[in-house]
């Protein structure tokens, strides 16, 4: 994430005399992201963080995975080209309902976990 790596974009921006904007970042290590944000700031490039909440740590607020979430994911990734495949893959509906309701509850901001490393990598502070 160095200036040299994005120099072609910087030259283009300068040649057309228009601002440059990085649509989204957030899918790398905290160290890489911190260096990349610094490079963009030093070169007057705006950027957006992606996304606000997720299940892992590449976000501002982490969502705790509810019990049986692995079954929800297994169903979502199972073959469903035929009715038989759908029926064969269909998990217990009460377990799935509870897992989905728990996910909704865990997604509320007050139940999320601040991802301090990610936040610091963007040059921001946690209060």
Where are the predicted features?
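Substrate-binding cleft of secreted/luminal carbohydrate-active enzymes
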Residues: 3-126
């Amino acid at each position: 994430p160095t200036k040299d790596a994005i120099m072609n974009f910087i030259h283009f921006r300068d040649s057309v005399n228009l601002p440059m904007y990085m649509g989204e970042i957030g899918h790398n290590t905290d160290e890489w992201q911190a260096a990349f944000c610094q490079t963009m700031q030093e070169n007057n490039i705006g950027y957006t963080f992606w996304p606000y909440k997720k299940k892992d740590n590449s976000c501002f607020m982490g969502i705790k995975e509810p019990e049986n979430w692995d079954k929800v994911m297994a169903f979502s990734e199972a073959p469903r080209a035929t009715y038989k495949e759908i029926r064969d893959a269909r998990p217990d509906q009460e377990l799935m309902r509870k897992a989905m309701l728990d996910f909704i509850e865990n997604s509320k901001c007050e139940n999320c976990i601040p991802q301090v490393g990610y936040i610091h990598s963007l040059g921001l502070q946690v209060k």
